Design a protein with these regions (language model features):
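Bacterial N-terminal signal peptides that target proteins for export
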Residues: 1-11
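Second-shell loop/turn segments in exported
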Residues: 126-129, 138-147
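Sec-dependent signal peptide cleavage junction
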Residues: 17-26
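Aromatic- and Gly/Pro-rich donor/ligand-binding loops
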Residues: 153
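Intrinsically disordered or highly flexible coil/loop and linker segments, enriched in small
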Residues: 20, 166-170, 330
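Long, well-ordered mid-to-C-terminal structural blocks that present hydrophobic/aromatic surfaces
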Residues: 300-333
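A contiguous strand-loop segment
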Residues: 27-135, 156-312
Length: 333
């Protein structure tokens, strides 16, 4: 219960941050492995800068009859501001768990917790808003309803997206339970995908955060190279290399860098996203001397995760997420 209270307090604080946000559509996320925290808790933080539905609803779990269906609505994260469209149904499972719903659903009764940031990616190559079914908030809700661990949540969201299609832009989810944290990233199947094509309806991968490290992401794909020889620390979608190979985005024998293939990072000289990740590491791992860099440079100069200078407390995360991250730095206006 102690860990659950801390997780809930942290998530509630992040939700409150979102209500005061400006319409910049920018998000900063932080994850802390259990051996990197002061009390052995895993922690996930997510600030949402944008106009999303900040109302919190407790969606009750329960048992369900055979043949029951689940309604899927387009873009439910903004359903407080406009009508949402019913786009399809999928079969319900026998049992679901109670979860907290808001613009981006964030935690269930089993302690599975999700943070989120958007990176959109290469729309021309991967976006499919016509024949694919799920937006990211749909997958979050379904994962939280059906999963009792972080790894199971990743697997459920990935499998559903492959079967029914992913209709949103590129997204990153920080998926945690009391023991571990997985960083899940997903991109669409391309505009010509259909459910009966025999091809997966999404391209996703996930990478485990080491227990003694912290992770940060901010509106850019962060997974980097996928190690297909390390299934203990990486997961990936069916035939993930095939479509990028067809497009000429990847050549057999080269490292499979998810961030380069599915996001538009190369040649990007902005500091908008990388500056926020840099500031998190600057605050929590200052002794390592990370230097500010642009989006393209961040792929090699800012790590996926890093050991903090000292054990991280809940108060440390509150401070990181609530302060103006650029204040008194090279990025300060």
């Amino acid at each position: 219960m102690k860990i659950m209270r801390k997780v809930l307090c942290l998530v509630m604080a992040i939700v409150m941050l979102s209500t005061a946000a400006i319409a910049a559509n920018a998000c900063t996320t932080v994850a802390v492995g259990k051996d990197a925290s002061a009390d052995g808790s895993t922690m996930v933080a997510h600030s949402v800068d944008g106009w999303y539905d900040e109302r919190i609803e407790i969606v009750k779990g329960g048992t369900h009859a055979e043949g029951e269906m689940v309604d899927i609505y387009r873009d439910p994260c903004q359903d407080g501001y406009r009508e949402v469209q019913l786009v399809g149904q999928i079969p319900q499972v026998a049992e679901t768990y109670t979860y907290f719903d808001t613009g981006y659903p964030f935690m269930n009764e089993k302690g599975v917790t999700i943070g989120e940031h958007t990176w959109s990616g290469d729309y021309n190559a991967f976006y499919n808003g016509e024949t694919a079914l799920f937006m990211i908030a749909n997958l979050q809700a379904l994962g939280l309803q059906r999963a009792s661990t972080a790894k199971e949540c990743v697997q459920i969201m990935g499998a559903l997206a492959e079967e029914y299609g992913y209709a949103d832009g590129g997204e990153t989810l920080l998926v945690a339970d009391k023991d571990e944290i997985w960083i899940f990233e997903i991109s669409g199947p391309g505009m010509f995908w259909t459910k009966d094509s025999g091809k997966p309806g999404a391209h996703w991968a996930a990478r485990r955060v080491p227990d003694d490290e912290i992770h940060s992401g901010a509106n850019r794909s962060i997974l980097r190279e996928i190690d297909f020889n390390d299934p203990e620390n990486y997961m990936w979608s069916t035939d993930i290399t095939e479509y990028p190979k067809e497009l000429g985005y990847w050549t057999e024998g080269e490292p499979f860098n998810y961030s380069i293939i599915f996001d538009t990072v190369e040649g990007n000289e902005a500091y908008t996203c990388s500056g926020r990740v840099w500031r998190v590491y600057d605050l929590l791992a200052n002794s390592q001397g990370f230097e500010i860099c642009n989006e393209e440079q961040a792929l090699t100069q800012l790590p996926f995760s890093v050991k903090p200078d000292q054990k991280v407390t809940l108060q440390d995360i509150f401070a990181v997420c609530s302060r103006f991250l650029a204040q008194a730095t090279i990025l300060s206006p």
